[in-house]
Amino acid sequence: RGVPGAISSATEAIKSGRKIIVAKDNEDEVGLINGEGCLIADHLQAVCAFLEGKHALERPKPTDAVSRALQHDLSDVVGQEQGKRGLEITAAGGHNLLLIGPPGTGKTMLASRINGLLPDLSNEEALESAAILSLVNAESVQKQWRQRPFRSPHHSASLTAMVGGGAIPGPGEISLAHNGVLFLDELPEFERRTLDALREPIESGQIHLSRTRAKITYPARFQLVAAMNPSPTGHYQGNHNRCTPEQTLRYLNRLSGPFLDRFDLSLEIPLPPPGILSKTVVPGESSATVKQRVMAARERQFKRQNKLNAWLDSPEIRQFCKLESEDAMWLEGTLIHLGLSIRAWQRLLKVARTIADIDQSDIITRQHLQEAVSYRAIDRLLIHLQKLLT
């Protein structure tokens, strides 16, 4: 009978130079790694006979990954140029992205296209992601092999479902999104304690689970992409707005400041101009075209610092995100105006560094800083509401 985690067990056995016998039900799963030390048995009697030298066991047949064409292309998105640009920067630097806008503006449509901009999984990443998925859904390992994870849990998901748990702690959504994207739609509808539990994994790339029977650490290095309405009714200005500033601010306060600080970019996704959807529109850039720029920017980052900009720590930010003195003074004044924290300042610098890398620039210019500051929609919204209340 098949067991969860077979591909992980087989990989570790092969690494250590040992042989492993796996159930026939797990053959398709372990066949993906094509390991010489892996053998298949369909019954315990066959295992006993093999150990007694009376029966030979076969190696698993090599399994081909299920090929899937790109389903969501960036060229399908009409308008929303700033949203597309923000998605490119997010993919290039490994950043976290928050999309804010009324219902029907294309927030989910944009988010679903980020995987088409990301590089293919390396062998190591593919094994890591498959090992985690095998623990909860072994049947999907072959289908998802070498596919970058894109997890989109419902806002009713419990804390345990999100971060993992159980008597013997199993992986949650954040670990299933390892090496991929965790998409949270209707962000303020999630429980606040569930969202705040994501803060540490976002910083460290792992989650520590401690229960009576076991303590375990799962990898959880994912990109967080989230979408939300700007108010309870979906609008905060114009004829569609039916909320007072107090109601809107109370709605936004469901999200803690420290949690919002984890987003490197927050973009406003507005309603499209009247008539644009009925016009003949020239298709925009394809995902493949944008992906080329993303790959070039990532190559610069790994050549310079051996990691993506999103994962730079404080000393590395000082080393790789240097500014001219005049630009540093300008940025300081901007941060004071927006009321940003030190963490938000560091994330803004990392976004500017990514924009410079997309431009193939060795230095961060004022133009790069200004563009990075323009992706702080949540801060501008909060300032706008606070002014209305004073």
Regions found by a protein language model. Give the residues of each.
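Basic, amphipathic alpha-helical bundle interface domains used for macromolecular binding and assembly
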Residues: I168-P169, E191-L385, L389-T390
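Short loop/turn elements that form and flank the Walker-type P-loop nucleotide-binding site
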Residues: K15-S16, N34, A92-G94, S156-A157, ...
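Walker A/P-loop
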Residues: L98-E139, S204
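P-loop NTPase nucleotide-binding/switch module
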Residues: H55-I89, G93, N123-I174
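Peripheral, non-AAA+ core regions of ATP-driven protein-machinery
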Residues: R1-L98, P102-T108, S210, A344-W345, ...
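Walker B catalytic acidic pair
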Residues: N179, D185-L187, A197
